[in-house]
Amino acid sequence: MPSLKGTQTEKNILTAFAGESQARNRYTYAATKAREEGYVQIADIFSETADQEREHAKRFFRFLEGGEAEVRACFPAGVIGTTAENLKQAAEGELYEWGSMYPDFAKTAREEGFEAVAKVFEAIAVAEKQHEKRYRGLLANVEAGTVFKKSKKVVWRCRNCGYIHEGEEAPAVCPACAHPRAHFEVLAENW
């Protein structure tokens, strides 16, 4: 691959690296807030997504050749809200990445002759699209009050001990391990 030094693609990679790095930290903070509010599953999803953002940042960082590069970019700053607010902000950020930023960066990379970089921007955009979808689904559950209560019987699983319960809502306390409702999720059999 030709040198990235001094190209717009180098600046775009550095911008993406900074954005992914900051998203990782914001999601880590949002995970703490979700746990405080009693949403253990959502906290774990924020943490999992933070780890995925770290991997995206690492992938971008490996393209960089060292030295200094100046970029101008805007990032969300300074506010960790409620879990609902954090989910909404996260979904909007993910939409921006996959919907415009990364496609634009891929186009520039192609124009400058960096096909491998363009493909990475496009591949990471696929993950960001799924992140947005998941955050919007979780937000809908929080807003509707259906994180721990559904309109029909479902199977609930205690994330702490594995206890299974069938009903319209998760138990207030797990009868097996005595952990609070916050540790229950709808059972997902995705193997």
Regions found by a protein language model. Give the residues of each.
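Non-heme di-metal
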Residues: 1-191
